């Protein structure tokens, strides 16, 4: 737990929340400023400021929990789909520096939009090969070993 982290305090019970799911590694609770009814935040119990700092095992656990919670939220609210996302870093809209996945149930006509509504610029499509190569090179430099989650 990080001393001044809002989500660490929620996970420890110091600050109340509307918990919907908990296991040894993940805690999920309702967003207090929901984008739609059922908007749930899924967070690792271990404190990570950034998604890219996470251990591979915790990434797998977080996303498996997010998958289960998305299915439950969609069923509970008769949603026709969901936005599932992470704001990674302050510039991307991360308001609490503790990794969390937003699960936002969606219905036709709800007024919401898709992921491209977050930021959209017209990229230069003539340099897609260069862009892809830049990412592949960076992946090789930052690659971690593959992980198999037991059980």
PLM regions with names:
Residues 1-151:
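HIT superfamily nucleotide-processing domains
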